[in-house]
A protein has these predicted regions:
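Short amphipathic alpha-helix that is part of the acyltransferase structural core
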Residues: 1-51, 55, 188-190, 197-200
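Conserved GNAT acetyl-CoA-binding A-motif
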Residues: 108-124
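Conserved acetyl-CoA-binding loop-helix of GNAT-fold acetyltransferases
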Residues: 90-108
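Conserved acetyl-CoA binding element of GNAT-fold acetyltransferases
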Residues: 71-93
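Local sequence-structure signature of Cys/Sec-based thiol-disulfide redox active-site neighborhoods
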Residues: 167-204
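Conserved catalytic-core motifs of GNAT/GCN5-like acyltransferases
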Residues: 121-122, 138-152
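Conserved beta-strand in the GNAT
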Residues: 48, 55-66, 77, 82
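Non-catalytic, surface beta->alpha helical segment in thiol-disulfide oxidoreductase systems
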Residues: 235-261
Length: 261
């Protein structure tokens, strides 16, 4: 196995998170590519794990803290580590040490870039990005938000612990129309799928929807709202991990529209 950096030849695999086979991925639009074009000169780092057959099986992406969902100084933040585990497409690459190798490479790279530590998030439920896995790699919890844990590995005594950015205000319920508010960053295709489906669903109700879209690549938007990736329908946050189906989103909006009359 080897760890390679992103190249122009592997960009398309990166944009779809190694899931070229996925029908759902078609709903993601070009949000990830736009985010990449914006971030590629702002400290974004991407690495791939490649097996002995020269097949890409996993990836890691990490950014400076000031371009992430956390508050921190002189830190890099892992947005995600993803080792392809589906039978479809390229197949299952789990349990081969790719995740550990990717994380180690990111730590070494972050040190060389002068960062004081590497930060990540983890979930306390047994799914993607498990907090328990990061704990075994030497990461410690420094903040909590629901089922999410903010974890880090400081590299020196000068490192200051990070914390989650928390909402400073929330979208309000609509008055004469249903309010649909989207906070979109673009780094995650799963979130982008949810955003694109929500926009399509909102368009099904002309004259009934007040659609607001905020680009959270802008740090000013993040500092104003304290929100990075979310969808609100009439002031209520909906779950977008994993991305809900178009039908489910449309049903939520239709229910609110019905109450207008």
């Amino acid at each position: 196995m080897k760890i390679n950096d992103l190249t122009p030849e592997t960009e398309n695999q990166y944009f779809c998170c190694l899931e070229e086979w996925s029908e759902d991925m078609k709903d993601a639009g070009n949000g990830k590519q736009k985010w990449y074009e914006y971030m590629k000169d702002k400290g974004l780092r991407v690495k791939f794990a490649i097996d002995d057959n020269n097949a890409i099986g996993g990836m890691i992406q990490y950014v400076p803290a000031e371009h992430s969902m956390i508050e921190g100084k002189n830190l890099y933040v892992v947005l995600c580590i993803w080792v392809h585990g589906h039978k479809q497409g390229r197949g299952d690459f789990r349990k081969k040490g790719m995740g550990k190798a990717l994380l180690k490479a990111a730590e070494e790279d972050s040190r060389n870039l002068g960062a004081s530590g590497l930060v990540t998030w983890g979930l306390i439920i047994p799914v993607f990005m498990k907090a328990s896995w990061f704990r075994r790699q030497g990461y410690k919890v420094v903040d909590r938000d629901g089922i999410m844990r903010l974890m880090w590995k400081p590299f020196n005594d000068a490192a200051t612990a990070p914390k989650f950015i928390r909402p400073r205000r929330l979208p309000a319920k609509g008055k004469d129309k249903v309010d649909v508010t989207i906070f979109k960053n673009g780094w995650c295709p799963n979130f982008n799928i949810a955003y694109e489906r929500t926009i399509r669903a909102a368009e099904e109700f002309p004259g009934k929807i007040n659609l607001n879209e905020y680009d959270t690549k802008s740090r000013g938007v993040v500092e104003d709202w304290g929100i990075t990736d979310s969808i609100f329908i009439d002031g209520k946050k909906i779950n977008i991990g994993p991305a809900p189906t178009y039908e489910k989103i449309r049903k939520k909006i239709a229910k609110k529209v019905k109450k207008l009359s």
